[in-house]
Amino acid sequence: MPRKGYVAKRDVLPDPMYNSKLVSRLINRLMIDGKRGTASTILYDAFDIIKEETGNEPLEVFEEAMNNIMPVLEVKARRIGGSNYQVPIEVRPERRTTLGLRWLVSYARLRGEHTMDQRLAREIMDAANNTGAAVKKREDTHKMADANRAFAHYRW
């Protein structure tokens, strides 16, 4: 933690093709070793695949997928009287988006398709249809929070 006070959060510039900050953040999440050009090519190719297969606007499909992935509740460990409790808490909007993007990219990387643009396109389409590994992760997170609802009074 910085001792000199609050560090201002830098604003992400929207991407040039879709003029969307969410797309720009996804490109940043896809990027490995600073190769933004490669990451944006992968994403735009994935969006082309989505447009071909669904016939819908890829940005709308992506936003629908993100709404289905982003968690509302999560659990946080809290130590009270020598015991660790998993306390359910609401997820802040910024963290919701961050978790959604992180889960989307990580589960897309684990898929079996040949290229990353195909994997990402499939994961986005699955998430838009409320299926897929990223949506399952959200459901598991919500189940965990629901199971530990008894400890909700330990919130801080």
UniProtKB/Swiss-Prot annotation:
GO CC terms, sorted: small ribosomal subunit
Xref: CDD domains: uS7_Bacteria
PROSITE patterns in alphabetical order: RIBOSOMAL_S7
Any one Gene Ontology molecular-function term assigned to this protein's record: rRNA binding
Record's function text: One of the primary rRNA binding proteins, it binds directly to 16S rRNA where it nucleates assembly of the head domain of the 30S subunit. Is located at the subunit interface close to the decoding center, probably blocks exit of the E-site tRNA.
Quaternary structure, from the entry: Part of the 30S ribosomal subunit. Contacts proteins S9 and S11.
Protein's recorded name: Small ribosomal subunit protein uS7
Species whose genome carries this gene: Latilactobacillus sakei subsp. sakei (strain 23K)
